[in-house]
Structure formats: structure tokens, C-alpha cells
Amino acid sequence: IGTKYAVGVNSGTDAIKLSLKALNIGPGDEVITAANTFVATVGPICELDATPVFVDCNDTFCMDTNLVEEKITSKTKAFLPVHYTGYMTDMRVMNRLSEKYDIPVIEDACQSILGAIDGKNAGTWGKTGAFSLHPLKNINVWSDGGVIVTDDDELYKTLRLLRNHGF
């Protein structure tokens, strides 16, 4: 897919949750995400006692990046764009905002395994990318599964610990 590391987990939901935990997202934090998504994107945010902040979507049903900046507050600790049906949130804009505000990006690429912008694959633009291998997803296994991808050495180590009941 184009990253240094991939960490297998039991689901796309856990791929998102462990990514959030690895970035120390918790009580009182806000996570900006797409209004058009499945509970598996928002559930992990709430499970960590953080607050989802929703951004409306554009014609591709992905987050409208023109509306993201107005949602940023001092409590914003992560961006969680959702790529949908092969379409991707404009990650060039998301990464510019990430650099400008020092807010990490976790990509929900569970529905866009083969999506790409400028030849760069979905899930490879942010600090982590979360993929689902659920039977109803683009690439699936007989039961369920998930994958977290990253280029960050320390995040990789943390994710491996968290995957095995680490704290």
C-alpha cells in the first residue's frame, strides 16, 4: 500500500480506536470527522470519551475540506476524514491543515482501499490509515479483520502494544 508498517487487528473499528489511543486522544478532546459515516467511525471516538465534531460532505459524500477549518478549536486533537466508495477526502488540504494547526490525521479508509490522489493511496496520507476487512468491504476475509498502516516508528511500536491489550 506504500507504508513502512501494517498492524493487523480484529476490525476496522479497532483500527480507528487504536489509532486514536496511540495518539493519546481522550476525555475532553475533539475529533473532526465526516457527517456521512458509519457508527464504527464515531463509536471509537465516544468510547474514549472524546467528542466527534461533524463536517458536512461534498458531492462525493466525503468530508468537504472547505468546511473543516471553521470547526477547529483549542480542543481539536485529531482529524478523522472518511474515504467513501473509492473516493477520498482531499488529503492535500487535510495535510495542510494538519501542518498548520499541528493536528494529526487518522484516515478511515475502510471503504476506499484502492482510492488514490496523485498516485498516493488512501490510508497513506495521515499518521495512520485504518482499513476494514469485513465481508461487506472492498477487500474482505471470511469473518472480520482490520489493518492499521503507518510510517511512524514510534506509533508502530505503540500500536503493536495496544493490539495486545497494552495500555
PLM region descriptions:
Residues 1-19, 33-37, 55-56:
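Short loop-beta-helix segment that forms the pyridoxal 5′-phosphate
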Residues 9, 34, 82, 132, ...:
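Conserved residues at the C-terminal ends of beta-strands
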Residues 11, 57, 84, 135, ...:
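Short, conserved catalytic or interaction motifs in soluble domains
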Residues 21-109, 116:
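PLP-dependent aminotransferase-like
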Residues 112-118, 125-167:
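Active-site region of PLP-dependent enzymes
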